[in-house]
From Swiss-Prot:
Heterodimer of an alpha chain and a beta chain. Beta-2-microglobulin is the beta-chain of major histocompatibility complex class I molecules. GO terms for biological process: antigen processing and presentation of peptide antigen via MHC class I. The lineage of its organism: Eukaryota, Metazoa, Chordata, Craniata, Vertebrata. Keywords: Immunity, Immunoglobulin domain, MHC I, Secreted. It holds the Pfam family C1-set. GO terms for cellular component: extracellular region; MHC class I protein complex. Its main location: secreted. Residues 11-37 form the Ig-like C1-type domain. It is found in: Secreted. The keyword Transferase does not apply. This is Beta-2-microglobulin. It comes from Oreochromis niloticus (Nile tilapia). It comes from the Eukaryota. Component of the class I major histocompatibility complex (MHC). Involved in the presentation of peptide antigens to the immune system.
Length: 37
């Protein structure tokens, strides 16, 4: 699940929060990409 910390406003920075649960094995690496990069 990915969501914004605050309501987005075009042209302004914000923080994306990624929440992963019930994933096994518990040690994983998650990478967020913009346009596949």
């Amino acid at each position: 699940q990915v969501y914004w910390r605050h309501p987005g406003e075009y042209g302004k920075e914000d923080v994306l929060i990624c929440h992963v649960s019930n994933f096994h094995p518990p040690d994983i690496t998650i990478t967020l990409l913009k346009n596949g990069e």
